[in-house]
Every structure is written in C-alpha cells, then in structure tokens.
Amino acid sequence: MNYLAHLHLGGQRPGQLLGSLYGDFVKGRLQGQFAPEIEGAIQLHRSIDVFTDRHPLVDVALSRFSLTRRRYAGIVLDVFFDHCLARDWTLYADRPLALFTSDVYRVLSSERQLPERLAKIAPHMVANDWLGSYQEFEVLDQVLGGISRRLTRPEELAAAMQELRRLYEPLSEDFRLFYPQLQDFARNYPTT
C-alpha cells in the first residue's frame, strides 16, 4: 500500500495520521522517540505492509506483471492500489476524499518535527494534492517517475504505465477483492 491507503487505514486522529505516513520514513526499532499514538500507527503501517506482502490476492496481482517488470511490480502495484482507492473512495470511506486529504494536509503542515525525507516532500505533497490526485490514472506516470529517480535501475519502471493500462481491469478487480480484507485487518489490529 502507498500513502493514501496507509492514511485511510491508520486512524483519523492527528498522531495516527502522522504515524501512518512515518511508516515509510522511519526505520528500525521504535523506542519512545515518538508519542505512543504515532508509534502505534507506525507499527500498524508495518503490519499492513507484512499482511499485504503475504496475501494470496496480492500474489495473484503481482503474477499478472510481465517478467521484465516483476522486480518492481510491488511498487507499481502499491501506487495503482492507491489509485483504485482514490477512484472508488466512496465505497470505502464515509467522508469525501477532499475533506480527508484536507485534514491530512492540515496535520502535516502543522507538524514541525517531521522525519527528514518526509519534511522535504511534505510541502510538495500538500501544494500539489498528491493524495487527491491519485484519482486520475495519468498521474501515476508522474508518481512512478518520481519513484524511479530513487532506484538503482530506473529503466525497469519506464514502461510501467503501458503495463498498468493493459492490466487495468484485472488489477482493479484484485483491489476490489483485497481491500475489504485489508480494512478488516486494520480495524482488528490491537491498539495500545
């Protein structure tokens, strides 16, 4: 899962929203460096990643990608699943996406102690409405382009959009089957 799904699943309180994002930016053991609510959300983020990586429906989705794209298929699928969530937001959330993202951006903008890499991208995330923009399929090309700049072999992501176009319907169906199970997992995750 990518940013939007983690934020959606991680809880709506400010500390939970922050921790849901921090999960991609904070590595190693958590030993009281953040408030308990933030650390709890980081732990949930990590557990969501493990649940997702081990789920048979995700294995099916990953197997749809060509062998040349398999190395980074997990990254591409995470981004695509955020697109599916944004596109079909009303099926999975009670509040409109624009209100949800506005709350996330408000919390993010008011936090002064963001992890270093998140602090660098947060202003761009807010200014360009990264989370809301996932509704538009073509935005994924920009997202994947940004990710590819951090990879050792960026050329392997170069044709990912062509593959996503080809796999759009089957991967969308994979998401429709998988996401409710992920919601149940997150809802039943033990909180501290």
Model-flagged regions — what are they?
Residues 1-93, 162-192:
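An N-terminal structural lobe/cap that precedes and organizes the functional/catalytic core
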Residues 99-184, 188:
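An amphipathic alpha-helical core segment
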